[in-house]
Amino acid sequence: PRPAHVVAWRAVLPADAPAQPTVRVWDPFVRIFHWSLVGLFTVAFATGDESERLHLAAGYAIAGLVLLRLVWGFVGSKHARFNDFVRSPGKVRTFMALAMRFRAPRVLGHNPAGGMMILALLAMLIGISATGFMMTTDPFWGAEWVEELHEALVYASLWLIVVHIAGVVFSSIEHGENLVKA
């Protein structure tokens, strides 16, 4: 049985129930960054072997977005800043243990697991961008290990994206809120 504090995904509220206030956590930059990244990553992935020009353009745009996000992580709004969501591995483990029992606290902004995921995805994107750029330079032109590393990072990122989406769905169910609209 589901613990009493977990709201059912399709809970029906009485007509006279007070409306829950909508809290917009993510600033416009974070929203635009996120969905632009989704689109550009999709384009880059889809064109990797088909259209070098489009693939490179998407890759450079991703690198630019990541650079801007890194800066925004230090100077942006409260919940966009790294110091708001980067937690120690111990706190991430504790949070995950609570989440597995549907007892994780509700967090405005990224929860500890989400913060760790953001760091992992940013690291992957930096690695993908760096190896992609390396393949365009004379010293690494045709270096098979660079291309293999680039592709391995892409596929590792896809795995992280699946875990990220699963985490958002899980947390949305656990807390009875649509995190995509947060």
Summary of predicted features, one role per range:
Residues 1-182:
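Membrane-embedded alpha-helical bundles that constitute the cytochrome b-like, heme-associated redox core
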